[in-house]
Amino acid sequence: DEHGVGMSFHMSPAKLDPEGFLEEFGHRPMIHLAEIGVLKDDVSITHCVQVDNQELAVMAETGVSVAHCPTTALKVSYGVTQVGKMPEMAMAGINLGIGTDGNNASNYSDLMRATYLVAGLFKDARTDPQMFPAEKAYEMATLGGARAMNAQDEIGSLEVGKKADVVLHDTDRPEWRPLLNVMNQLVWSADGRGVHTVFVDGTKVVEAGRMLTIDEDRFWAQCQEAGEAITARSGLPDKSKYPVL
C-alpha cells in the first residue's frame, strides 16, 4: 500500500495449499487471506485451481485478479479441468489474466500457446463450445493481464494515451492462410513462432523474428552452457528415454 505496487503470489495450484491452510489456520487459503486483510483489488493470484465456492465468492467481493496458467496445470496435473472454476470466476466478474508460470513447470513462455489452451480446456471440461470464445481468451491475454498488474491505464490495448505495445505477425504462413477470421486464427492457429515485429512502448525490439536488443546467438550459447552446468552440479540422472545425437 505504501508504494502503490500491489502484490502477486502463487496460491492453491494443487491440494497441498488448502490442506496445509486448513491444518494450520482452520480455513482455506482465500478465506484466511481475506480475514487478515491481504485480498484487495491490487492483488493478483496465480493458479487458483483448488478453490471452493466460498473462496470464489470472497475473491469476487475483494476484487482480486487471477493469473490462469493452463500449461503448468496440465503438465503438473493440478486437476484444472476437473475442479477448476475459471468459468465461474469469469461469470462472477473476477478479472482473469493468462500466465505461463515458470519454465521449470510449464516448459515454455509462449503466451499464445497458453491462450489456445484457455480457449479450449473448459469447452471440453464442460462440454460447452461457447466456453471462453477466442475473443474472451484474447482479452484475458491482453487487458486481463494489464488489469492484473494494475497497469490497464498504460498497457493492454491500443488506445490514445497508452504505451504503443504492438505485435505484428507474418501472415504469409500456413496458420494464417486463408486469412478469414483473424481472431479465431490468432487464438487457435498462430503461436509465437509467427511473430515478425514487436514494438514495446514505441521502440522496436524484434524484427524478422529476432531480438534487436541482445546478441541472440551469444545468448543461446550462454543458455546452453548454463543449463549444462546446472545439470552437472545437480548430480541428477539424465531422464531422456531416447538417445540424443
Residue ranges of predicted features:
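Structural signal for hydrophobic packing residues in well-ordered secondary-structure cores
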Residues: 1-4, 37, 119-123, 149, ...
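Conserved, mostly hydrophobic/aromatic
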Residues: 10, 45, 59, 66, ...
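Short, acidic/turn-prone active-site loops that include or flank metal/cofactor-
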Residues: 13, 70-75, 102-103
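Short, charged, surface-exposed secondary-structure boundary motifs
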Residues: 76-81, 108, 178
